[in-house]
Amino acid sequence: MAGTLKHVTDDSFEQDVLKNDKPVLVDFWAAWCGPCRQIAPSLEAIAAEYGDKIEIVKLNIDENPGTAAKYGVMSIPTLNVYQGGEVAKTIVGAKPKAAIVRDLEDFIAD
């Protein structure tokens, strides 16, 4: 599945994210959001590099407004890391790949 991140929905969020054994980074995004498109290649690269430690998925807020509202996502891109069914970290705004990796250090370190 290289080059494409899994898409989750309001309906699949609990099973795919909250009940996942691994930490899951959820990219809250929308098709009209330029910065969201800018970080997509970085997220795909991080998924390829660290996929054994963290799962990275995308949630389109226009198609799935319920989950975004539930977690208070007010601006995009917002990256939430869920661990054990809870938000463990929130990253707001577009950042370079290296900065995102630094933010994820607690979840991807050996």
UniProtKB/Swiss-Prot annotation:
It is found in: Cytoplasm. Keywords: Cytoplasm, Disulfide bond, Electron transport, Redox-active center, Transport. One of its GO terms (molecular function) is protein-disulfide reductase activity. Disulfide bonds join 33-36. InterPro entries: Thioredoxin, Thioredoxin-like_sf, Thioredoxin_CS, Thioredoxin_domain. It holds the Pfam family Thioredoxin. GO terms for cellular component: cytoplasm; cytosol. Its main location: cytoplasm. CDD domains: TRX_family. Induction: Expressed from 2 promoters, 1 of which (trxBp1) is under control of SigR, and further transiently induced (about 50-fold) by the thiol-oxidizing agent diamide. Part of the trxB-trxA operon. GO terms for biological process: cell redox homeostasis. Residues 2-109 form the Thioredoxin domain. SUPFAM superfamilies: Thioredoxin-like. Component of the thioredoxin-thioredoxin reductase system. Participates in various redox reactions through the reversible oxidation of its active center dithiol to a disulfide and catalyzes dithiol-disulfide exchange reactions. Stimulates complex formation between sigma factor SigR and its cognate anti-sigma factor RsrA probably by reducing RsrA. Belongs to the thioredoxin family. This is Thioredoxin 1. It comes from Streptomyces coelicolor (strain ATCC BAA-471 / A3(2) / M145).
